[in-house]
Amino acid sequence: MAIEYLGLSEINGPLVVLEGVKNASYEEIVEFHMEDGTQKIGRIVEIYEDKAVIQVFEGTDNMSLGNTHTRLTGHPMEIGLSPEILGRTFNGIGQPIDGLGEITPEVSLNINGLPLNPVTREYPRNYINTGISAIDGLTTLIRGQKLPIFSGNGLPHDKLAAQIVQQASLGADSDEKFAIVFAAMGVKYDVAEFFRRTFEESGASDHVVMFLNLANDPVVERLLTPKIDLTAAEYLAFEKGMHILVILTDITSFCEAMREVSSSKGEIPSRKGYPGYLYSELATLYERAGIVRGGTGSVTQIPILTMPNDDITHPIPDLTGYITEGQIVLDRQLHGQAIYPPINVLPSLSRLMKDGIGEGFTRADHQDVANQLFSCYAKVGDARALASVIGEDELSPLDKQYLVFGKAFEAEFVGQSETENRSIIETLDKGWELLGLLPREELDRIDTKVLDQYYRETVR
């Protein structure tokens, strides 16, 4: 039975304190009824003796200490879901904002989800094609993987996210059901409108579920958006048998919201002012990716985060790296050279790539091509460093060939237009074309039989 209380003992930013509480539960949803007839919703975030600290989703404006009626609902926050959510746009707490009316829920699920039993997890296999060579060829995204994008302020991660949404697929030969669940947290209105317009104009919106939390929305809502987004993804994957790609941008906004709320609660801060439980909170999001043994669906994650001051050792990218299975790093220097997407392939990594590529998945030579491209591009850095000391004219003919290869690799393999959707075969063929700029004897990471089949000298 729901219990109702009259009055609050304290209001502090987005938090209120209720005294004399009985049988309250952590994460329980609370309803507030103000004297002017308006209503608000919150959730219990801390319980101490008979006191409950409650986060108010819509902010604490118009709330008074004496005349606010508080009702404990007795259950955590849930979201109503059905297949109708495909093609729809919601706000950060799951309310439709596209003018198409309410959905008819088939089921209501707790947004905190249920942890996947490690024993029931299936090891990720097979790949998701993004149409972007630097990702598909060198840091391949595997179904069930969590592969973050490390970006920085001013870099085109929004444009890259939109391109992935438009182009992502399970491959030309797959007839399995595929959809994207997209969440934007703390974004400006023009960025949200860019995503909405881009998805609609490209026709991608039909297989996209979008959750938008704007910069002027309550900060508490930002903490719920990724959980609601992932709950929708789990429903489509594990109950409807679909392969779901989840894109979360910007995780940094989520963490900053957590820091703000933690400060309001008077908690002792940890690194850079973030709460000590930042790691566990990020883990509760990232670990919701995966495949359940015996099921047909999967949840794959691409969380996008902006590194403050491009610092990869900042707590957010640092802790993210511990939890996830690799990273894709955007580079400001490449962006300054007008290379899009500005992916720096050397610090980028997909730890599960080896198990979802090759014969039966992409093409038999995929791993060899990737290894050789990494090796050759690393030598480009050595040649450039030497040229900066002695001058390019003094380099050996081989070092000059590496400089030519490096320039072509950045412009033609890493670089592509935002509307160019390359198949995995086109990506691998492009890799062989660029390797043809170097002498065959330099390709020491590839078996002789594979070289005989694919290597052709490229003359320019």
Please tell me what each predicted stretch does.
Residues 11, 90-92, 129, 135, ...:
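Short glycine/serine/threonine-biased micro-segments
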